[in-house]
Amino acid sequence: YKDTRSGFTIIEVVLVLAIAGLIFLMVFIALPQLQRAQRDTQRRNDIIKLQSAIETFKGNNNGRLPAGKCDVPDSDDPKLGDFTASKDRDNSACRLIKEYMHDNNDASINTFTDPGGQTYDIVIEKYNDAFNAPNQMDHIMHVLTGATCDGELPMKSNNSRDFVIVYRLEGSGVYCHGNNG
């Protein structure tokens, strides 16, 4: 006796469902890692943008590096409230943000925010051996003058005009980027 009905057997259906389940599982495991890597890439690009702003600042200020700390208080509007609260500060770290890191159409808007929309704080200080790399995501970009990068960590440079930017990434440790390569 031969059955001529067309259709799938239960084994074929279960096999297709199992394969589909594996594909969905791989997507759900890989997607957060891809998103985290994408956010870290944006942070690296932000660090390069900050380096460029510092180089421009140096060029406009007789080779002097900016100094100080520009931490902005929390606000409901991370792009406007934080920057407005800090834009009138006189230290050169805040001037760096105000004059070199603003929106081209509106100088009162701080566009220097991380991929999550949180405003970056900037701490600019002379490197010393006691510096500890950030161990958590605190949205602080550490600019260390008189330093160069040794992998992920800064180290003392013989040139006082060298600087590095150190930031804790979300997925892959600490990122150290220097102006000397």
Describe these PLM feature segments:
Residues 32, 52-73, 102-106:
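Alpha-helix exit/C-cap motif
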Residues 5, 42, 157-160:
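A generic fold-level signal
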Residues 1-3, 119, 137, 163:
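Intrinsic disorder/low-complexity segments enriched in polar/small residues
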Residues 4-35, 39:
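N-terminal single-pass transmembrane signal-anchor helix
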Residues 36-50:
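Membrane-proximal amphipathic alpha-helices
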Residues 68-148:
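Acidic, glycine-rich loop-and-strand cores that form catalytic or ligand-binding grooves
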Residues 142-181:
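Short, surface-exposed interaction loops/tails
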